[in-house]
């Protein structure tokens, strides 16, 4: 386990600024030497029969359940609403039957498990022509993200809670790099979905005029949409935790009690791009399978919420 976490402070070596691009070099940190690094080729994983939503993935979650065990649900159907954030719902990552709702001490929600059907019924959402994405209103963006459940991809710092849709941050950070040990290299994954990644950034830029930081490694050449003046690039070089959003935020837009920023992962940006152009919720995700006990360390293309026991 890495001794550094996402809130670690690192020592800055140097900063180089090129207009809307910035290079930050970090010299203190640690690249944890763990064997079993995944081959950076994507393999299609075997199908799973169960998907789920974990309560631990959502800090300070207070759910108001909208389904019960035994209910049939569609992909994208709301499972529960966040009591502290009215209108923010977590939606089903697959179509099927709610097999279990697990709760812990003080009725803390642990998980909602769905057994998938052979045919996947799905909710559909608003979609827009590509040439209209750059003119969407703030309301159109927020409403579609809330309806689909993709709003929960936006996390607010400090505390990493789900972002409040009634507020706006000082900046939004897209994490397009990963310095965690055994992590997948985001660059080929983003390149393979270049169009959707660009569409997702365009949609996020419509949430306001705050800086939209795309944080990447120095060698990464990412497909960014043209004509968006507040989309900025920052390159981070150095050992772990150079690739974590907490590090990026610390150097670019430090937060405090009165200053909040939002962040999200590059795969969620791709999913947002697909949502707004197709009206469908994309559940495709790439995960890294690695470590000293893995016989074939590799990247797996699977689905959101996949049961790990069935996956491997």
Roles of regions detected by a PLM:
Residues 73-79, 305, 310-312:
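Short alpha-helical segments in extracytoplasmic peptidoglycan/chitin-binding modules
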Residues 17-66, 233-236:
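N-terminal, Lys/Arg-enriched amphipathic/low-complexity engagement segments
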Residues 87-95:
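Short coil-to-beta-strand transition motifs
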Residues 78-87, 105:
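Short, charged beta-turn/beta-strand-edge "cap" motif at the junction between a beta-strand
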Residues 67-81, 99-100:
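Short, well-structured beta-strand-loop connectors
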Residues 1-20:
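N-terminal amphipathic/basic-hydrophobic helices that include classical n-h-c signal peptides
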Residues 61, 67, 84-87, 296:
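Short, solvent-exposed loop/turn positions at domain surfaces
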Residues 88, 102-310:
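Buried, small/hydrophobic-residue-enriched core segments of structured protein domains
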């Amino acid at each position: 386990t890495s001794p550094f976490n996402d809130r670690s402070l690192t020592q800055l070596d140097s900063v180089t600024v090129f207009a809307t691009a910035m290079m930050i070099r970090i010299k203190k940190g640690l690249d944890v030497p763990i064997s079993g690094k995944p081959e950076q080729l994507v393999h299609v994983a075997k199908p799973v029969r169960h998907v789920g939503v974990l309560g631990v993935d959502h800090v300070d979650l207070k759910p108001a359940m909208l389904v019960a065990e035994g209910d049939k649900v569609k992909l994208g159907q709301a499972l529960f609403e966040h009591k502290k954030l009215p209108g923010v719902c977590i939606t089903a990552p697959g179509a099927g039957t709610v097999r279990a709702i697990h709760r812990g001490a003080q009725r803390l929600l642990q998980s909602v498990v769905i057994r998938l059907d052979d045919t996947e019924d799905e909710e559909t959402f608003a979609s827009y022509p590509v040439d209209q994405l750059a003119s969407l209103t703030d309301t159109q963006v927020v409403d579609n993200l809330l309806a689909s459940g993709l709003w929960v991809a936006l996390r607010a710092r400090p505390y990493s809670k789900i972002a409040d849709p009634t507020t706006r941050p000082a900046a939004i950070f897209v994490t397009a790099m990963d310095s965690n040990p055994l992590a997948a290299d985001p660059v080929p994954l983003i390149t393979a979905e270049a169009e959707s990644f660009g569409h997702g950034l365009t949609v996020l830029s419509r949430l306001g005029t705050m800086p939209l930081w795309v944080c990447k490694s120095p060698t990464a050449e990412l497909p960014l949409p043209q004509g968006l003046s507040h989309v900025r690039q920052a390159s981070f070089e150095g050992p772990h935790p150079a690739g974590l959003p907490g590090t990026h935020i610390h150097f670019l837009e430090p937060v405090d009690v009165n200053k909040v920023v939002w962040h999200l992962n590059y795969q969620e940006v791709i999913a947002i791009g697909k949502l707004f152009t197709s009206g469908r919720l994309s559940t495709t995700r790439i995960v890294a399978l690695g470590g000293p006990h893995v016989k074939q360390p590799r990247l797996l293309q699977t689905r959101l919420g996949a049961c790990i026991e069935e996956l491997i």
